[in-house]
A protein has these predicted regions:
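N-terminal leader/linker segments that precede catalytic domains of diphosphate-processing enzymes
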Residues: 2-337
């Protein structure tokens, strides 16, 4: 797209955003459950760089949007684990936050990213990361819904679906030690705490072997039926670092234990979705908008089964929006495909 065409398109976006503000359906926030057809807007005032780039984008500054990198993130959930629920907050001077005594019906496993990370440093996130070329190219032993079935659900190609599902399972293994796999036919629970598992986990994380090679050597199959699609978020075109991220929900498999032994995080904990949101509101945890939205989607769940059965939020592809008052936010209509 030429520079002049880009400016024209963005000028039209600004005009439509402002002129159509009163004509839109109700504007939702990311603190409300999303669904296809909803219109959502959210502030990014806590991220001055994002606001600055969004203003420049709407003003028609020269910008060739970068292609977003495919990524996968997994909300690993379990019944409440009060004895594991602890985070130290860098926003509260590093002091441990008081544990909750009463167990919540659902906890989610989260990691606090290292302050040295280029992307979302110090943020509390779910396990996940970018899709690797070998996630697509390497044959992965498979059980559960096929890549073709996932592709229809995810609105992507079959190779992309295979790669994204593989990346989701691989990232969970690398960052939490949990293996969304089993012997063919779903045999006895896997105990992943042995030294040999730690060595192979490190080998996968450092790309010495692919996740598919690891599964084949162990006689295991990836269990795509252990994952449920939650939402799909794409970073706005105004950003230089963009991700095309599918969020999944997975139950903690019987007999397995999540940890945070990854170089990308400084701590890990099980925490109730509502508790994470309350700590964010209190300025004790840093959460980014997609994380806030996905936590909100299961905050009312009274059981792991209820969280599992929560409907798909939809595809969220936000773009800069200039409100009539002059505030710049991000927003979009949530789509079904």
């Amino acid at each position: 797209m030429s520079e002049s065409a880009g400016k024209t398109r963005r000028a039209a976006e600004v005009a439509a955003n402002v002129a159509g503000a009163t004509e839109r359906r109700r504007v939702q926030s990311i603190r409300e459950p999303l669904s296809p057809g909803a219109y959502v807007e959210y502030s990014v005032d806590d991220q001055p760089g994002v606001v600055e780039r969004a203003r420049a984008y709407l003003a028609g500054a020269p910008c060739e949007p970068v292609a977003p990198r495919r990524a996968a993130t997994v909300m690993l959930v379990s019944e409440g684990k009060p004895h594991y629920r602890r985070f130290e907050s860098p926003l509260a001077g590093g002091a441990p936050i008081e544990e909750t005594v009463d167990a919540a019906p659902v906890d989610v496993f989260m990691l606090r990213r290292a302050s040295t990370m280029a992307f979302t440093p110090d943020a509390v996130v779910f396990p996940g990361g970018g899709m690797d070329a070998r996630d697509v190219e390497c044959a992965v032993p498979w059980a559960g819904p096929s890549p073709e079935q996932w592709a229809r659900l995810m609105s992507c190609t079959e190779p992309e679906a295979r790669g994204i599902i593989t990346a989701a399972a691989r990232e969970v293994f690398e960052e939490s030690g949990v293996l969304l796999a089993s012997a063919p036919g779903g045999a006895a629970p896997i105990d992943e705490r042995g030294a040999h598992w730690a060595c192979e986990r490190e080998a996968v994380a450092t790309r010495q072997i692919s996740f598919g090679e690891f599964l084949r050597e162990r006689g295991l199959v990836l269990r795509s039926d252990l994952m449920r699609l939650r939402s799909h978020w794409v970073t706005p075109e105004s950003e230089a670092r963009r991700y095309d991220t599918y969020f999944f929900l997975a139950r903690l498999p019987e007999g397995q234990h999540a940890d945070g032994r990854t170089s990308e995080a400084v701590e890990a904990a099980w925490i109730a979705p509502g508790e994470a949101l309350m700590r964010f509101d209190a300025g004790l945890l840093k959460l980014v908008p997609p994380t806030i939205s996905n936590l909100t989607s299961i905050v009312a769940a009274t059981s792991v089964d209820e969280a599992w059965n929560t409907p798909f939020d939809g595809h969220v592809r936000p773009h800069p929006v200039a409100r009539a008052c002059g505030e710049v936010v991000l927003g979009c209509e949530v789509s079904e495909t």
